[in-house]
Regions:
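Canonical Rossmann dinucleotide-binding motif of NAD(H)/NADP(H)-dependent dehydrogenases/reductases
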Residues: 2-31
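Conserved NAD(P)H cofactor-binding loop of Rossmann-fold oxidoreductase domains
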Residues: 72-77
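Rossmann-fold cofactor-recognition segment
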Residues: 36-50
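Active-site loop immediately N-terminal to the catalytic Tyr-X3-Lys motif
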Residues: 81, 126-132
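Substrate-binding pocket helix/loop in short-chain dehydrogenase/reductase
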Residues: 79-89
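Residue(s) in the substrate-gating loop at a strand-loop-helix junction
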Residues: 121
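Active-site helix of classical SDR
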Residues: 103, 137
Length: 149
């Protein structure tokens, strides 16, 4: 079903992202993972514009079209008491800005019937104390998803 399809997964070094990447591979897809953690994937900080541009170039050197973009990377989860301005800004860059920019970078290279999946959370509507940075990022990705649709 996914033979020779191209899938991009952010935050795919562990957890849900790793499971998604593994399932795409099992189904025959070419999978490109980007994660800040070291490993056998493209290593980079997606909060950085230059990293996203280099990653997109890396993928597009190998494939003309992309079939799936899975924006899964986990933003910082800190509460207002412990979250610095820089932490909050980083959470929004990872959780909202990077997904926006990846879609923009690949927009001219999406295959017919391509899919973009942005991992959100019910946390954007049902917040918990000490998770304000995560909650804001998940609210942002939900709004971006709606706008892109």
């Amino acid at each position: 079903m996914f033979k020779d399809k191209v899938a991009i997964v952010t935050g795919g070094a562990q957890g849900i992202g790793m499971c998604i990447a593994d399932e795409f591979r099992k189904a025959g897809a070419h999978v490109y993972v980007i994660d800040i953690q070291e490993g056998p994937h493209y290593v980079g900080d997606i909060s950085r514009k230059e990293t996203l541009e280099a990653f997109a170039a890396y993928v597009l050197e190998r494939h003309e079209k992309v079939d799936f973009i899975i924006n899964n990377a986990l933003p910082v989860m800190k509460g207002i008491a412990d979250c610095s301005y820089e932490d909050f800004e980083y959470a929004l860059k990872v959780g909202v800005t990077a997904p926006f920019y990846l879609v923009k970078l690949f927009s001219d290279h999406l295959a017919d019937a391509a899919s973009i999946v942005n991992m959100s959370s019910s946390r954007d509507r049902m917040s918990q104390p000490q998770t304000e940075s995560y909650t804001a990022a998940k609210g942002g990705i939900a709004a971006l998803t709606h706008a892109l649709a």
